[in-house]
Curated annotation (Swiss-Prot):
Its EC number is 3.13.2.1. Pfam families: AdoHcyase, AdoHcyase_NAD. NCBIfam families: ahcY, PRK05476.2-3. It comes from Nostoc sp. (strain PCC 7120 / SAG 25.82 / UTEX 2576). Its cofactor is NAD(+). This is Adenosylhomocysteinase. GO terms for cellular component: cytosol. May play a key role in the regulation of the intracellular concentration of adenosylhomocysteine. It catalyses: S-adenosyl-L-homocysteine + H2O = L-homocysteine + adenosine.
Length: 425
């Protein structure tokens, strides 16, 4: 249902959900002291005054604090969902009603609605785009070349989105600066590892109420998200198997104490399969065919392409929902495969996404990346740019201070030593 308000355009499920969203946003804020400090500074300095901004992100309590910080900084912001199943409808309602931020997102929206919301966002003629998977940027490049002149730059938070941006740059169509937030140390070391690890298992447990102890859990991909997922699954008593295509990551998984197998060998052994690769069809027909009866598969990468769901649907006698966000595919071979969250991000489809404490740093990076683009307008070459090291370090310092933790600094003697080549044995 589209709600209407006399104050601003929006499409959310129900504005009556705003009180619950307000309460949950306030709770999340307790764990986000870094972003709060940035918001307070933005409110004084107004770095985005007069600028139009589009944020394509998962509409969660944590994202709400990013949007509020950007508005405090003077941004004329519009918010849309980066995934059809990740929107928290109460949060969307609160942002509209309590903060007067236009939101176009509803949990469970179909692909046509999702794509229409991308077009609505681009109708805002953004000067800055915060993207999560690069759908908005890709649409801009493919369909709205005339609007690129309005753009100062973009930021991207996901591995999947960075892969797309690199491909765009290689093809010569990334003609504006894009800040790679994903590779900031204060993002991927914590968000990708600790955030994904915890929230993925949270989503699986909420969807199934299954006991992980003693189960064979196959983690497909051993990047930072895979590392975190494997670590947490082992911590809950699972027997973890890792599959990889990168020999270096495979060695790392082995030395971290995990079994490493080709997917063809892991498929008949697994009870639960979790994909975290950002690539297409990493679990496909030949794997589904040999899985145990009742095997559970889910995705914690980005898009819903990691599992070949078209194959499953084509080879299913029956598909039925057995629990919320849990569908059983009864196959023609007599076995069944259980798919969680329609193959989309299980941590957001069935749970609430990453904990606020890690998103505090990720969204601090997003906020400061936007400020970096504004401060360097016209100075940055087209293509990908890293978060400045000093920004990364400052976010870490602020986080430590908020935790009541303080660290040492180099003495003058040590600084002199590490900058000299004359001292030796």
């Amino acid at each position: 249902m589209t709600a209407t308000s006399p104050r601003l355009k929006h499409e959310v499920k129900d504005l009556a959900l705003a009180p619950l969203g307000r309460q949950r946003i306030e709770w999340a804020g307790r764990e986000m002291p870094v972003l709060r400090q940035i918001r307070d500074r933005f409110a004084q300095e107004k770095p985005f005054a007069g600028l139009r901004l589009v944020a394509c992100a998962h509409i969660t309590t944590e994202t709400a604090h990013l949007a509020i910080a950007l508005k405090a900084g003077g941004a004329d912001a519009v918010l849309i969902a980066s995934n059809p199943l990740s929107t928290q409808d109460d949060v969307a309602a609160s942002l509209v009603l309590d903060h007067e931020i236009p939101v176009f997102a509803q949990k469970g929206e179909d692909n046509a609605t999702y794509n229409r919301h991308v077009q609505i966002a681009l109708d805002h003629r953004p000067n800055i785009i915060i993207d999560d998977g690069s759908d908005v940027v890709a649409t801009l490049v493919q369909e709205r070349q005339h609007q690129i002149a309005d753009l100062i730059g973009t930021t991207e938070e996901t591995t999947t989105g960075i892969v797309r941006l690199r491909a765009m740059f290689k093809d010569g169509v990334l003609t504006f600066p894009a800040v790679n937030v994903n590779d900031a140390d204060t993002k991927h070391f914590f968000d990708n590892r600790y955030g994904t690890g915890q929230s993925t298992l949270d989503g699986i447990i909420r969807a199934t109420n299954i006991l992980l102890a003693g189960k064979n859990v196959v983690v497909v991909g051993y990047g930072w998200c895979g590392k975190g997922t494997a670590l947490r699954a082992r911590g809950m008593g699972a027997n973890v198997i890792v599959t990889e295509i990168d020999p270096i990551k495979a060695i790392e998984a082995v030395m971290d104490g995990f079994r490493v197998l080709p997917m063809a060998e892991a498929a008949p052994q697994g009870d639960i399969f979790i994909t975290v690769t950002g690539n297409k069809h990493v679990v496909r027909g030949e794997h589904f065919d040999v899985m145990k009866d009742g095997a559970i598969v889910c995705n914690s990468g980005h898009f819903d392409l990691e599992l070949d769901l078209k194959y499953l649907a084509a080879n299913a006698k029956e598909i039925k929902e057995v629990r919320p966000f849990t569908e059983e595919y009864k196959l023609t071979n007599g076995k069944s495969v259980v798919v969680l969250g329609q193959g989309r991000l299980i941590n957001l489809a069935a749970a609430e996404g990453h904990p606020s404490a890690v998103m505090d740093m990720s969204f601090a990076n997003q906020a400061l990346a936007c400020e970096y683009l504004v401060k360097n307008k016209g100075k940055l070459a087209p293509g990908l740019h890293s978060i400045p090291v000093e920004v990364d370090q400052e976010i870490a310092r602020l986080k430590l201070q908020a935790m009541g933790i303080y660290i040492d600094s180099l003495t003058p003697e040590q600084i002199e030593y590490i900058n000299s080549w004359t001292s030796g044995t």
